Amino acid sequence: MIQISDLTFSWPGQSTPTLKINNLHIKKGEQLFLHGPSGSGKSTLLGLLAGIHTAQHGTIEILNENLAALNDAKRDKFRADHIGTIFQNFNLLPYLSPIDNVLLGCNFSKRRQANLKAINITAEAQALKLLNELGIDEDTQHRSVNELSIGQQQRVAAARAFIGQPELIIADEPTSALDADNRDIFIKQLFEQAEQYQATILFVSHDAGLASLFDRKVSLKDINGASL
């Protein structure tokens, strides 16, 4: 699913690299927990995986596609087609309903639309299915998302990530605003959706206590030569 090899990334004007990763492999269908404290380069790595940044050296391959070989437009298309994201601030549009926010995950990807057509379901039907399975009831589905609790907004963001069956889900500190009970419930729901849609999960957090819930734990400190 993901292969990182001999990667080096530095921000402009920086004398030393932020990231220097010789090797990281993530298998298809794996649920990987990537741990690192604030400022360790976690978000930078996710930006590289999402094609938002490009490394000065080395390769990142996702689904056997070398991201560095793609131009900006093709990287944007690849991200829209194959990667669902759940970020700490959710990036929901406050004036839209949960359903309309979820549908945005499909609106910019013909591949995701084709994935749904192949299983004979409309985007709206899958949006409703995802929201129901993630605990957003029918009444809440039609309210503005700015009326929802943090936990509800988080589940809307998760539904948006999964719609159209992208192969990779990237979650960046999505549970930081939740208490322990709601955090564990959300992660369980995330795993259920990933299993149903055969998605790989890369979950990034500073909270090492979450590691036991995942198939595999990787510490960014252990693989990032720039931090040594």
Kindly label every feature range from the protein language model.
Residues 50:
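Helix-to-loop junction immediately C-terminal to a conserved catalytic motif
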Residues 158:
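Hydrophobic anchor residue at the start of the ABC signature
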Residues 66, 118-139:
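Conserved ABC ATPase "signature" region
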Residues 58-66:
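Conserved ABC transporter NBD signature motif
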Residues 165:
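Conserved catalytic motifs of ABC-family nucleotide-binding domains
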Residues 169-172:
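Catalytic Walker B motif of ABC-type/P-loop ATPase nucleotide-binding domains
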Residues 144-148, 152:
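Conserved ABC ATPase signature
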